[in-house]
C-alpha cells in the first residue's frame, strides 16, 4: 500500500533576511542584465524549467500562494520597488541571485510577478507549494533484499547506493509494454518468475528449429539473464527484474554453432514488435582473436536500426567481455564494437571495475555485477528450476560477468522506453551517455572528451542510473 505523506517544500535560507519598506526611491529599480540562470548547474536549470511552467498549475492552487521563488539581478534593497512589489525578500543561500518573495495578498502575487517579468526585472518566478509524496515501491519477492544491484543498502558490505537506481522510477515505470529479446542459450519460460512476462509468439529455438527456446538443463545462462532484465516482480516469488513489467522473448542461439545467416535471423526477429535485443555473449575472451559479425548479420542489424520499431530503430545491448585477466580488450569484439551496439562493462558493489571486465573505446556504459570482495558478491536472479542450471533451486545467487551487467542495462532501457516510446535508438544512447553516473571517480582512466563529457575506457560514460535517465 502506498502511504501518502504531506511535506512542506523546504528552501535553505541565509541567516540574514530583509524586510522591505521605506520611502519610494527617486528612480526605478536598477535592472541588471545578467543571465543568472545560466550560472546554475544544468540539473538546477532543468528543475527551474519544470517549476516555472505556470500553465502546469491549477488557477485555484496559485491563488493561495503567498511565497514565490524569484531569480533577479536587482539588488535586494530595491526589490520592493519592482512592479511585483513583494512585502518581503529573503536570499536563497545556495542559489546566488535567487530569492523568496512574499506577498501579503496572495491573489495578486502572480499578476504582479508577471508584470515584473515582462519589464525584464526578474528572470524567473515559480510558486512554493506544499508537495505530496509517497513511499517508493518495494517488491514483495522473497529474494529482493539480496538483489543489491537493484537496491544496494550495504547488505553485502558494499557501498550503499551503488546500484542501478531503478527504485527511483518504479512508482511510475516498470517496463510495461516493452519487449526484450534475450538472445542466449535458451530461456526456461515455464519458470514461475518468468512465465507471466514471456511471449511465445516472439520467441524461437534456432538450434532446434522450432518455436520453443526451452534450454537444456545445464544451460542456465539465458534464464539468469532474463531474470536480471525482466523477472516478474511483486508476485511473492523468487526475485524481481530491473524492468519487472517488461515482456520477454526467448531466442536459443548460442547453445549450438550458428551461421552468419542464423545470427542475422535471430538478431532481427520480429523487429517491429521487439524493442531491445539483449546479448550477453561474444567471441572467446582469450585476448588472441579479432572476431565480429558477418555481412548478413551486419546488414540485418542495420535494417533493424533504420526500420525496426516502426522506423525508430531497435536497441542492441552487448556484453563488453570478461577477458581482462587474459589482457583481452573489448575493441577486439566486433559485435560489441558495432556503432549500433551499447557495449556494457561491469562494476562491483563498491562501484569499481570487476576483475574480469574488459576495457575498450567502444564501451558506452557500465552496470553492476559480481566481482567485489570478500566473496565476489554475485547477482541474485532466476535459475533453471530443480537441479539444473547454476544451483539446486529456482534462484541463483552467483550469476555475474558482463553477462549480468548487460541485461541490467536492457532493463533500464525498458524503463526509459516505457516513459517515452517514441525515442529512437540514438535517443536512447544519448540519454544513457548524459544520465550515467561517474563511478570510481578517482580512477585515472577518466578523461574529458572533445564534446566536454567525462569518459573512461573502463567505464564508458559511467554507471547506468535509471532515476537520472
Task: Please annotate each region the language model reported.
Residues 44-47, 99-100, 124-127, 179-183, ...:
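Structural recognition of the beta-strand scaffold that forms the well-ordered cores
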Residues 20, 28-35, 109-111, 143-182, ...:
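N-terminal domain-start motif of subtilase-like serine proteases
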Residues 270, 274-280, 313-314, 341, ...:
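C-terminal subdomain of the subtilisin-like protease fold in secreted/lumenal serine endopeptidases
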Residues 1-23:
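Secretory targeting signatures
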Residues 22-139:
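Inhibitory N-terminal propeptides of secreted protease zymogens
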Residues 184, 333-418, 422, 464:
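Extracellular S/T/G-rich loop segment that most often corresponds to the catalytic His/Ser-adjacent loop
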Residues 20-24, 85-96, 117-179, 192-193, ...:
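Protease zymogen maturation seam
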Residues 158, 165-167, 178-180, 185-189, ...:
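Subtilisin-like peptidase catalytic core
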Amino acid at each position: 500500500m502506498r502511504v501518502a505523506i504531506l511535506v512542506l517544500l523546504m528552501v535553505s535560507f541565509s541567516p540574514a533576511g530583509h524586510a522591505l519598506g521605506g520611502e519610494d526611491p527617486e528612480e526605478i529599480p536598477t535592472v541588471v542584465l545578467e543571465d543568472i540562470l545560466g550560472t546554475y548547474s544544468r540539473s538546477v536549470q532543468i528543475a527551474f524549467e519544470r517549476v516555472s511552467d505556470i500553465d502546469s498549475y491549477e488557477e485555484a492552487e496559485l491563488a493561495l500562494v503567498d511565497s514565490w521563488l524569484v531569480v533577479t539581478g536587482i539588488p535586494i534593497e530595491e526589490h520592493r520597488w519592482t512592479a511585483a512589489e513583494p512585502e518581503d525578500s529573503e536570499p536563497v543561500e545556495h542559489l546566488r541571485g535567487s530569492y523568496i518573495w512574499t506577498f501579503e495578498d496572495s491573489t495578486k502575487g502572480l499578476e504582479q510577478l508577471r508584470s515584473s517579468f515582462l519589464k525584464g526585472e526578474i528572470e524567473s518566478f515559480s510558486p512554493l507549494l506544499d508537495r505530496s509524496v509517497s513511499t517508493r515501491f518495494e517488491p514483495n519477492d522473497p529474494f529482493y533484499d539480496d538483489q543489491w544491484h537493484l537496491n544496494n543498502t550495504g547488505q553485502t558490505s558494499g557501498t550503499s547506493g551503488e546500484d542501478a537506481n531503478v527504485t527511483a522510477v518504479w512508482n511510475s515505470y516498470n517496463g510495461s509494454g516493452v519487449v526484450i529479446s534475450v538472445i542466449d542459450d535458451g530461456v526456461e519460460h515455464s519458470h514461475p518468475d518468468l512465465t507471466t512476462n514471456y511471449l511465445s509468439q516472439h520467441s524461437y529455438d534456432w538450434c532446434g528449429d522450432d518455436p520453443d527456446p526451452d534450454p537444456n538443463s545445464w544451460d542456465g545462462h539465458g534464464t539468469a539473464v532474463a531474470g536480471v532484465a525482466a523477472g516478474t516482480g511483486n508476485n511473492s516469488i523468487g526475485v524481481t527484474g530491473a524492468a519487472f513489467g517488461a515482456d520477454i522473448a526467448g531466442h536459443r542461439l548460442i547453445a549450438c554453432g550458428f551461421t552468419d545467416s542464423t545470427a542475422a535471423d535471430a538478431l532481427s526477429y520480429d523487429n517491429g514488435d521487439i524493442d531491445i535485443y539483449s546479448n550477453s555473449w561474444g567471441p572467446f575472451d582469450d585476448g588472441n582473436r579479432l572476431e565480429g559479425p558477418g555481412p548478413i548479420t551486419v546488414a540485418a542489424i542495420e535494417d533493424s536500426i533504420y526500420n525496426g520499431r516502426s522506423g525508430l530503430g531497435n536497441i542492441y545491448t552487448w556484453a563488453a567481455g570478461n577477458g581482462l585477466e587474459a589482457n583481452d580488450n573489448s575493441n577486439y569484439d566486433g559485435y560489441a564494437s558495432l556503432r549500433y551496439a551499447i557495449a556494457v562493462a561491469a562494476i562491483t558493489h563498491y562501484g569499481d571495475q570487476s576483475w574480469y571486465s574488459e576495457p575498450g573505446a567502444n564501451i558506452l556504459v557500465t552496470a553492476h555485477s559480481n566481482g567485489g570482495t570478500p566473496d565476489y558478491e554475485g547477482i541474485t536472479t532466476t535459475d533453471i528450476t530443480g537441479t539444473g542450471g547454476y544451483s539446486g533451486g529456482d534462484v541463483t545467487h552467483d550469476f555475474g560477468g558482463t553477462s549480468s551487467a548487460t541485461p541490467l542495462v536492457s532493463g533500464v532501457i525498458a524503463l526509459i522506453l516505457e516513459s517515452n516510446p517514441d525515442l529512437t535508438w540514438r535517443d536512447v544512447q544519448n540519454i544513457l551517455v548524459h544520465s550515467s553516473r561517474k563511478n570510481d571517480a578517482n580512477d585515472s582512466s577518466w578523461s574529458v572528451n572533445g564534446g566536454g563529457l567525462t569518459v573512461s575506457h573502463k567505464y564508458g560514460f559511467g554507471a547506468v542510473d535509471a532515476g537520472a535517465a
